[in-house]
Structure formats: structure tokens, C-alpha cells
Curated annotation (Swiss-Prot):
Gene transcribed to yield this protein: alr
Described purpose of this protein according to its UniProt entry: Catalyzes the interconversion of L-alanine and D-alanine. May also act on other amino acids.
Family statement: Belongs to the alanine racemase family.
Pathway listed: Amino-acid biosynthesis; D-alanine biosynthesis; D-alanine from L-alanine: step 1/1
Organism encoding this protein: Thioalkalivibrio sulfidiphilus (strain HL-EbGR7)
SUPFAM superfamilies: Alanine racemase C-terminal domain-like, PLP-binding barrel
Cited InterPro entries: Ala_racemase, Ala_racemase/Decarboxylase_C, Ala_racemase_C, Ala_racemase_N, Ala_racemase_pyridoxalP-BS, PLP-binding_barrel
Residue sites binding substrate per the record: 132, 305
Cofactor field: pyridoxal 5'-phosphate
Protein name, as recorded: Alanine racemase
Top EC class for this record: isomerase
Length: 361
């Protein structure tokens, strides 16, 4: 069931942000990351909007590849988690120009024994320091040669890694990871891909044949301590919901579950049809900003499943039906995430089935 709360998706802002990525990495091709429903923005709509600007799309799983191909999306697809078994691998081959990432010897064993309808392009992922997915860098040459020799594989496997600390450019880990990657792959053929959003913007040495911008495409900052606006990123998602009631409260009145917020003076409160069931962070504290009639107001009390309360004492004329902006245009999602003790990625991805996605541009 859809609620009155909605997320407006500005596709022109999305395209602007991809152009920002291209300017930051002018010698690289762009593998736009659209996994997890394009960080909550709607994978198919985002893929169609970027089809003329991106060079490929990065996705998480084969289910996403299937959805894109069935919808007529034809750009190359790189499956970051690769495949689980032979059945998935066969489906990848049938979908056409879907490129799985190989990050384990188990996947390589499956690839070697699979009878595929067509050879695949693949990527070899090296674990240079994040210690999540990837094979040992010291084995890169042996592994690449082993993969390239297979009849199931078309061409030379690409080489990729993922950066653990690129969002904090002053830390040494990114430089160390690049050194490990370069030492392991110096004499090897194949295209390279390293840079995520943060590295695209602040680590030119990581921008190789392909870059993989993700969060920056959606207008949030990937860098600790830097705003999206300062990075020439425009908000793509603006979440808003209507006021459903306005109440006058007396000094001493407590608001919400637990009564943790107590009015210190008479206040005017607006109840808004948005809650954690819609993807708003439950842990957002009192004082977290929202926008009402273009002015900043503050949350009062705990966020409920379907509602939250806002202090509109200083905003005259607020009435049921008025729109309240929870994040987006004029109110950066990074600011709301920081107030709630989380990251913008989580908020954007949390916008679930109850909200309408409305596309403009």
C-alpha cells in the first residue's frame, strides 16, 4: 500500500552528477553503480536515464542483471558478487555481455567445469587490504593466466580491487592498497578498475581504465567532512510527506513514546506522515532538521513507525496537507544521516515499498 509520503527523483541531477564523475576522471570509462535499486532510486529508471552517458553498469547480483536485460537495457553489466554455481553462470552467459567478477577459487572451479552457451568476459578481483572479497594479489599472474586459458572466457580478464578507506583521503591505507595492486599487476595485461566515488573525487592515481562511481551519482558526499555541494553534486532524491495534524502543546507536555522530549515552553507541533516504516531513521534524535514552508524545523521526540513530530512554533500557518521535506533539496541527506548516527547510503537504500517514487527530468 502506498502512502502520501514520496520520494522525488531528479534525473537531471543524476546526469549532472555523472558528468561530475567524468570531469574528475577524464581518462577513465564510467561503470555506474546501480545495485540495490540504484541506492533506493529505482534501478530501471536510473539505468534508462544514464544509458546514453555511462559506459557500463555495476550491479550486485545476477537477479539484477536479469531484470535489466528483460527491460531492454543493453549496456555491459559487471556483477560485483559474481556467481554462486554453474546454473547462475549459464544464465549469465545467456543474458549477453554480463561480466561476472571472480573473487574466490571456488568460483574459478565452477567456471572451469561449466559448459557455457557462449564465452564470457570476466573480472578478477584482488584483495589488496579490505579483506572482504578478493583473491591474494601475489597470485594475480597465475590466476589471470589460468582464467584466460579457459574456453569459457573471452579475452583477457580485467583486474579490480576495492578501497577500504578512500572516504578519508588523509589516511595511508589507500596508498598502500594501490601499491599492493600495482606491484601484483605491473606486468599483466587487462583493463583495471579501482576507484569508487571517493577515489574518483580525491585520488587520481586510483582512476584507471574504469571508475565505479556509486553514492556520488545520487548526490551524497562520499568524503568525510566535505559536503556534496562543495563537490558539485546535486541531490537526486527529495523525500517529503504531508502534515496530518497540528497541535498546541503546553510547557511540561511530553511528546512521543517514552516521553523523552518534554516541552520547556508552549509549542506548536506538526505530526507528519513519515516514520521508520517508510525508511526514516528511527534513531534520529530530537533536533534533527526538517524543512517546512522552506524553513528549518526540528524533530520532537521519538520517530514512530508511521509518524514523526516536528516543532513548527516559529513557522506561521502550518496546516494539515502541507509538505514537509525530510531530506533532499535544501536539506542534505548527509546531514540527516549524521544526526541519526548512520550514513547516507543507508538512508537512501531504506526508502522502501511504501513510498512513491516520482521521476522528473
Amino acid at each position: 500500500m502506498r502512502r502520501a509520503a514520496r520520494a522525488r527523483i531528479d534525473l537531471n541531477a543524476l546526469r549532472h552528477n555523472l558528468r561530475t564523475a567524468r570531469r574528475a576522471a577524464p581518462r577513465s570509462r564510467v561503470m555506474a553503480v546501480i545495485k540495490a535499486e540504484a541506492y533506493g532510486h529505482g534501478m530501471l529508471a536510473v539505468a534508462r536515464a544514464l544509458a546514453a552517458q555511462a559506459d557500463a553498469f555495476a550491479i550486485s547480483c545476477i537477479d539484477e542483471a536479469r531484470v535489466l536485460r528483460e527491460a531492454g537495457v543493453t549496456l555491459p553489466l559487471v556483477v560485483l558478487q559474481g556467481f554462486r554455481d554453474a546454473a547462475q553462470l549459464i544464465e549469465v552467459a545467456r543474458l549477453g555481455d554480463v561480466q561476472p567478477v571472480i573473487h574466490s577459487t571456488g568460483q574459478l572451479d565452477v567456471l572451469e567445469s561449466a559448459a557455457l552457451p557462449a564465452p564470457l568476459r570476466v573480472w578478477l578481483k584482488l584483495d589488496t587490504g579490505m579483506h572482504r572479497l578478493g583473491l591474494p594479489p601475489g597470485e594475480a599472474a597465475v590466476l589471470q593466466n589460468r582464467i584466460a586459458a579457459l574456453p569459457q572466457v573471452a579475452g583477457v580478464p580485467g583486474l579490480m580491487t576495492h578501497l577500504a578507506c578512500a572516504d578519508e583521503p588523509e589516511r595511508p591505507e589507500t596508498g598502500i592498497q594501490l601499491q599492493v595492486f600495482d606491484a601484483a599487476t605491473a606486468d599483466l595485461p587487462g583493463e583495471r578498475s579501482i576507484a569508487n566515488s571517493a577515489a574518483v573525487l580525491r585520488t587520481p592515481a586510483a582512476c584507471r581504465d574504469w571508475v565505479r562511481p556509486g553514492i556520488m551519482l545520487y548526490g551524497a558526499s562520499p568524503l568525510a567532512g566535505e559536503t556534496a555541494q562543495s563537490l558539485d553534486l546535486q541531490p537526486v532524491m527529495t523525500v517529503s510527506a504531508p502534515v496530518v495534524a497540528v497541535k498546541r502543546l503546553a510547557a511540561g507536555d511530553a511528546v512521543g513514546y517514552g516521553g523523552g522530549y518534554v516541552c520547556q515552553s508552549p509549542r506548536t507541533m506538526a505530526v507528519v506522515a513519515m516514520g521508520y516504516g517508510d525508511g526514516y531513521p528511527r534513531h534520529a534524535p530530537s533536533g534533527t532538521p526538517v524543512r517546512v514552508h522552506g524553513r528549518r524545523c526540528a524533530l520532537m521526540g521519538r520517530v514512530s513507525m508511521d509518524m514523526l513530530c516536528v516543532d513548527v512554533t516559529e513557522v506561521p500557518g502550518v496546516a494539515p496537507g502541507d509538505d514537509v521535506t525530510l531530506w533532499g533539496e535544501g536539506l542534505p541527506v548527509d546531514e540527516i544521516a549524521a544526526a541519526a548516527g548512520t550514513i547516507s547510503y543507508e538512508l537512501l537504500c531504506s526508502v522502501g515499498g511504501r513510498l512513491r517514487l516520482e521521476y522528473v527530468g
